[in-house]
Every structure is written in C-alpha cells, then in structure tokens.
C-alpha cells in the first residue's frame, strides 16, 4: 500500500461523523450505553479536547454517554482500543498511521481495523522571526541562528524533518535546542533570528510577541509543503488565517498533524453512523 493511499484511509474526518450528529437524546430511548474514550494526561490539551468531544457525543447521540479516561499516550490508547478497555481514543495522525501500517513504534503490529471518524484539532508547524529582519519564508532562515525546540521534543523532531527538505541545517551553524518559551526569549534578547513551534495554534508565547508587534510569521512554499508531505503522510497542509495573532496581517501557509478520534472497525455500524 502506498503512503498516499494509506493517508486517505486513515485520515477520514467526515461531516457526518460522531462529532456532528445533530439529534437530541430521547429520554424514552431506554437504557443509556456508556462508552469509554481514552485521552491523554489529565487537563492536557488532548484531554480537554477529548472531554469536549465526549460532551458533544453524549449530548447529540441518542442513548449514548461517553466517559473520558486519562491515559499514558497515543500508543497505549491504541492498544487499549483493541483490548476492549476503550471504545474511542484520541490520537495524533502520526501514531494512527504507524498503527494502521505497522511501522515506526508499531513495527510488525498492524492495526488494520483502526478507523478515524473525526478530527479534533491540528498541531501546527509555526515559524516566526523578528520583524526587523524582513523575512517572510521559512527558507530565508538559512544561515540564521535558530531555536528549534527542546532536544528530543516533537518540535525538534519536526524541525529536523523540515531542515532535511530545506537544507537549512547544512548552512546554519547556530542551532539551539530551546523550548518555545525559551526561543521566544531568544527573539526578545536578539540571539535567535527564528524559532519553531509544533503545537496547537495559537501559541501563547507567540501571542505575547505578536502583541508587541515585533515578529513576522513565516510560510512554506507550496513546493516545500508538497515535499514535506510526500515523506510524511501523517501531515496535511493548513492555512493559519490572518488575524489569528495580533498584528498578523497575512495568512500563513504551513502544515499540521491532525489529532483524531479513532475507533475499531468492529464498532457497531449503526452506532458509528450516529
């Protein structure tokens, strides 16, 4: 199976999926069925998104109540989905892809019955630089000192993937492994000309800088995005609309990893449709 085809199978987020059912619960429907949704650590963004999704399902699907359970992460969620502990799980598209194809952390353990039924929110690649530099594209960061996320973090991993496509690491002698807030401080203190965040949008540390009107948001070219996505089927193109941040006048062309609600193909078809 090629990667493009696998992407089409795993990234299904239909308008008629579980998050957009519109019927109200009928008190005369009889006994309520409880479903368990695995999320992530208590009060994390993923956990809060799971609770919102669970509330939507509970309030719109007749005879169904969804209870959320914190978990130890995406791969554990997928394991518990198939051992019967969970009925639904929230996982990033990358973990879902690896499980579906039996690659990466799920090497040799295909979960071909994994189905994505809705997308909750995107994890977005967002680069910024000081406004005074006059940059508008990520590729223009070549040769500049950069803060690319804490070593071992998801932001640092994705930064490396971007560098492989753009050739940035070959020309940049100053690559600093600072987290998002540390990188933002680097822009203020003028030792970083660019910082990267691979996280939910808007980024709080960026909001503070944007309010000071001292930064610009950088876009990828369409060709760069095509090359990045070609090697990473878990990613999708996305536009960050103008006005997402204060003093952000232009939309930003970038990519994201969707966080998905997934179920097993063995789930009752009528319930899944609801």
Language model: regions and residue ranges:
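Pocket-flanking alpha-helical
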Residues: 50-55, 67-108, 127, 181-186, ...
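Short amphipathic alpha-helical coupling segments at ligand-binding clamshell hinges
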Residues: 268-273
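Short beta-strand-centered segments that line the small-molecule binding cleft or hinge
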Residues: 97-102, 112-121
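Pocket-lining segment of extracytoplasmic ligand-binding domains
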Residues: 93-95, 103-104, 133, 169-267
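C-terminal motif of bacterial Sec signal peptides marking the signal peptidase cleavage site
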Residues: 18-21
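Bilobed "Venus flytrap"/periplasmic-binding protein-like clamshell domains
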Residues: 32-60, 64-67, 122-189
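Bacterial signal peptide processing site
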Residues: 23-25
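N-terminal export leaders
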Residues: 3-8
């Amino acid at each position: 199976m090629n990667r493009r085809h696998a992407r089409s199978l795993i990234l299904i987020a239909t308008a008629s999926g579980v998050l957009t059912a519109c019927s109200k619960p009928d008190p005369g429907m009889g006994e309520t069925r409880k479903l368990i949704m695995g999320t992530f650590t208590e009060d994390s963004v993923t956990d809060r998104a799971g609770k919102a999704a669970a509330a939507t399902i509970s309030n719109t699907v007749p005879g169904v109540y969804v209870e959320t359970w914190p978990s130890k992460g995406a791969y554990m969620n997928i394991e518990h989905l198939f051992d019967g502990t969970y009925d639904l799980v929230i996982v990033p598209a990358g973990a879902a892809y690896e499980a579906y194809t039996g690659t990466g952390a799920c090497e040799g353990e295909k979960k071909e019955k994994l189905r994505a039924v809705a997308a909750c929110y995107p994890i977005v690649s967002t680069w910024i630089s000081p406004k005074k530099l006059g940059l508008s594209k990520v590729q223009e960061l070549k040769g500049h000192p950069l803060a690319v996320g804490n070593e071992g973090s998801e932001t640092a991993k994705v930064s490396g993937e971007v560098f492989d496509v753009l050739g940035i690491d070959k020309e940049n002698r100053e690559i600093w492994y600072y987290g998002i807030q540390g990188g933002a401080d680097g822009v203020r203190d003028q030792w970083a000309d660019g910082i990267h965040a691979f996280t939910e949008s808007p980024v709080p540390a960026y909001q503070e800088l944007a309010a000071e009107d001292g930064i610009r948001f950088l876009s990828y070219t369409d060709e760069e995005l095509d090359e990045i996505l070609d090697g990473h089927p878990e990613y999708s193109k996305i536009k960050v609309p103008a006005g997402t941040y204060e003093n952000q006048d232009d939309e930003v062309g970038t990519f994201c990893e969707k966080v998905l609600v997934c179920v097993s193909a063995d789930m009752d078809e009528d319930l899944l449709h609801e």
